[in-house]
Every structure is written in structure tokens, then in C-alpha cells.
């Protein structure tokens, strides 16, 4: 089953890459740009077929993909042009001016990438990452609204029998200890709380807020027990808890009064509505952006995990090999098949979200770097027009290729470090 999970992730990976490149391909053709190649993978070609003026194929190493567009860069002083790969890694070994001059055919003068208006070039380069974002959103919504996610529910897991300090064992209740509000009200394990103080809710966070907001109050609590609705009455205890700021962070040394009922909630798989799903995805995108920004700070710990005896944290950067291992572990978990499928779909969705964010970095040779170049050209031309100066012409992105080589070199080193860590000290979910 472990191997099956890895194979399934590889299929998801290939589809995600093909889907990304399809975004570039479709928009390039829509704007009349000639695309000689559409390839999934690198290395030797396993299969290819030419349709129209594009060769479609699959290569042996399934760790990337690319399309080739004619005239990616403006011609140099000698008037020569080239076709360049959209793949960052393949682009490292291509000369920005001369490698594909021979691919130009009669009539290509009107089918060059750099001759398209900047907004069209932005669309072509953005289309690839955008396809990954769309796929991630669709997969997330499928799981959230179709399967649900594991979260705390309003069902009672256990009831505290007495009110004691947090440092004491809740199972050791002395006769002198006061009964907890939940126990005094007759709340039992298995009860599903339907309403609190007249407010009906099936959301744990909302229920928790209602309890905290009513210290010292006598409130009715409606529960479902064995298919019947029962109204209990609880006197909410007063508790002093640490104050939190607007971001949910604890404010040191400050406390507030909050209500306490005295029970633990059960965890269950809960389907989300559309609004809840959008909120959840927004939080995950924010987390992904924060993790991307924190990558440089995590490199020392990653190095220690790969070459030392440091632990591999759950939020450690993970590459394709590490994600494939996680896919294999999911397939071996002793959980229902539907839950395995949901976890696997979430893994592929997260991978696509990462692809979107990573490719949008405004650095060559990534898609975001070409987008930044097109936007800069648009700004230069607009400024020249306002100031009534001569049109400066296309922005020569090829001049930034030395920077692109440095960026690509850093990416390669980081990828190798992650690969070693994924092999010798992988992130585990079990």
C-alpha cells in the first residue's frame, strides 16, 4: 500500500504539472504565439506526437515540465532571437540569445512572445500558476464540502466531575470539591449540545465563545440525547484566563474573566459550508505565504535535520520526494478509505497551492519574474507616453539572465538540501 500511495501521488504530480503548462500553452496559442513543444517531465522522451506546429510528449523524469515559446526574449544587437523554455531548470542551460535561432521559421516574425502587448504576456505567464490555484481551490472545496475535516464538535466527549485547579488531576475529586457546572446540570458524555442560552449552534468555536461570555449566569442548555431534545440548566462558573489580542496571541501578565462549563468536546469529521470553506482556504493561503516567507529562517534547522541529529519538524520544508513519502504513509493508515482519499486529495491540493505561490515570486527564471518584466515594460512605456518621450520598446528581460542563473543556483542548492532531508530524515504523519 505504501508503494501505491507513492504512485498515486506521482500521478497527481504529473497531472498538476501538465495542468500548469496547459495554462501557458492555451493562452499562448490564443494570442497567436508559436509553441514548438509541450512536455511533461524531463530527460529522454518516452512518447511524443506532433499536432499542428506543437510537439506534445512525456519524458522519463516526472519532476517538472515545460513549453517552448518562440521569441521569449527580444533580439540582441545582431538581430538574433531564440525559443526559451518556461521551465526554470531547463532555462538555466539555454542561452538567452542564440540557442534556438534555428527554430525560427518563415512567418514567425508575427508569432513571437516578446512582440505581444505586456498585458498579454502577463496573462500567458500568469496562466500556469493560476491553473494550479484553480485546481487547489477545487480540490479543497471537494474535501471540505464533500467529505469534511476533522475538528472539535458540540458533542460531549467527557464531563469534569468537579472544579479544581488546572494543575490537579481532574479525575481526583474530593468530596469537598464543588461539582462542575456541566456535572451539576446533568450533562453526559455523548450528549450533543444544540443550543446555549437560546442560541442554536453546531459550531464548537461559537459554542465556546458563548460559554466564555456568560460567567456566573444561569443558562438553559439544549442537548440531544438518544434522539430526544432535553433542556438542562447550568450555572456557568467564573474562571480567570489569559487575555488574547486580536491575533489570538496571549498577552503576557493580563487576564480576563471567562465562563467555564466543564466538559471536553469530541472530535469528528464535519462538512463545511461554502462560507466556512472559503474562510478555511483563506487561512491556509495565509499560512502558506507565511511559510514561504519563513523559508530562509528554516534552512539551518533543515541542514541540521539532514546532516546532523536535529529533529525534522512537521512544518519543515518538504520536496516532491517527501510529499510522495507522505502519500505512501496515508495509504498505510488504519482509517476508512474515504478519509484516506480526503487526506490524499488535500496533499495534492496543498502541493498545487505551493506551486502557485512559488511560481509567483518576482524572480527570474520563475513565471513571476517574467510577469514583473512585462509590468515594468508597461510602466516604462506609459511613463514615456505621459512625458511625451520616444517609446523605449520592449524591456530586455535577457539582460537579467545573470541574476536568473544565481537565483536558479540557489533554488537548486535548496532543492538538493530538501531532497537529502526527505530521504534521511523525512517528515512523518505517523
Curated annotation (Swiss-Prot):
Its main location: membrane. Keywords: Cell membrane, Hydrolase, Membrane, Metal-binding, Metalloprotease, Protease, Transmembrane, Transmembrane helix, Zinc. It is an enzyme of class 3 (hydrolase). SMART domains: PDZ. It comes from the Bacteria. Its cofactor is Zn(2+). The chain crosses the membrane at residues 122-144, 341-363, 402-424. It is found in: Cell membrane. It is a multi-pass membrane protein. Belongs to the peptidase M50B family. This is Putative zinc metalloprotease SCO5695.
Amino acid at each position: 500500500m505504501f508503494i501505491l500511495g507513492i504512485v498515486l501521488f506521482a500521478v497527481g504530480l504529473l497531472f498538476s504539472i501538465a495542468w500548469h503548462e496547459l495554462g501557458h500553452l492555451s493562452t499562448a496559442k490564443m494570442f497567436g504565439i508559436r509553441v514548438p513543444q509541450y512536455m511533461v517531465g524531463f530527460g529522454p522522451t518516452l512518447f511524443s506526437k506532433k499536432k499542428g506546429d506543437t510537439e506534445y510528449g512525456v519524458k522519463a523524469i516526472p519532476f517538472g515540465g515545460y513549453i517552448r515559446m518562440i521569441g521569449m526574449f527580444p533580439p540582441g544587437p545582431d538581430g538574433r532571437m531564440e525559443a526559451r523554455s518556461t521551465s526554470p531548470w531547463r532555462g538555466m542551460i539555454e542561452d538567452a540569445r542564440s540557442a534556438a535561432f534555428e527554430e525560427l521559421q518563415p512567418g514567425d516574425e508575427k508569432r513571437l512572445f516578446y512582440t505581444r502587448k505586456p498585458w498579454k504576456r502577463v496573462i500567458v505567464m500568469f496562466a500556469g500558476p493560476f491553473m494550479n490555484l484553480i485546481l487547489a481551490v477545487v480540490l479543497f472545496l471537494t474535501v471540505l464540502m464533500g467529505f469534511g475535516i476533522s475538528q472539535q464538535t458540540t458533542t460531549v466527549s467527557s464531563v469534569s466531575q468537579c472544579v479544581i485547579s488546572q494543575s490537579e488531576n481532574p479525575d481526583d475529586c474530593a468530596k469537598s470539591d464543588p461539582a462542575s457546572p456541566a456535572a451539576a446540570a446533568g450533562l453526559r458524555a455523548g450528549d450533543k449540545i444544540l443550543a446555549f442560552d437560546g442560541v442554536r449552534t453546531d459550531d464548537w468555536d461559537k459554542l465556546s465563545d458563548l460559554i466564555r461570555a456568560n460567567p456566573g449566569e444561569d443558562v438553559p442548555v439544549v442537548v440531544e440525547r438518544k434522539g430526544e431534545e432535553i433542556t438542562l440548566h447550568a450555572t456557568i462558573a467564573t474562571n480567570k484566563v489569559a487575555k488574547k489580542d486580536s491575533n489570538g496571541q496571549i498577552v503576557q501578565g493580563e487576564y480576563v474573566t471567562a465562563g467555564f462549563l466543564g466538559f471536553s468536546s469530541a472530535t469528528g469529521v464535519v462538512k463545511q459550508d461554502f462560507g466556512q470553506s472559503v474562510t478555511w482556504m483563506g487561512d491556509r493561503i495565509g499560512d502558506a505565504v507565511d511559510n514561504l516567507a519563513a523559508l530562509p529562517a528554516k534552512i539551518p534547522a533543515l541542514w541540521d535535520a539532514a546532516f546532523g541529529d536535529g529533529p525534522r519538524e512537521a512544518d519543515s520544508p518538504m520536496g516532491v520526494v517527501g510529499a510522495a513519502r507522505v502519500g505512501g504513509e496515508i495509504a498505510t493508515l488504519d482509517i476508512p478509505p474515504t478519509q484516506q482519499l480526503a487526506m490524499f486529495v488535500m496533499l495534492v491540493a496543498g502541493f498545487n497551492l505551493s506551486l502557485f505561490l512559488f511560481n509567483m515570486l518576482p524572480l527570474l527564471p520563475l513565471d513571476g519574474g517574467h510577469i514583473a518584466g512585462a509590468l515594468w515594460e508597461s510602466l516604462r512605456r506609459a511613463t514615456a507616453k505621459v512625458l511625451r518621450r520616444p517609446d523605449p520598446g520592449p524591456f530586455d528581460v535577457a539582460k537579467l539572465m545573470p541574476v536568473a542563473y544565481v537565483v536558479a543556483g540557489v533554488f537548486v542548492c535548496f532543492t538538493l538540501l530538501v531532497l537529502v532531508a526527505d530521504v534521511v530524515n523525512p517528515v512523518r504523519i505517523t
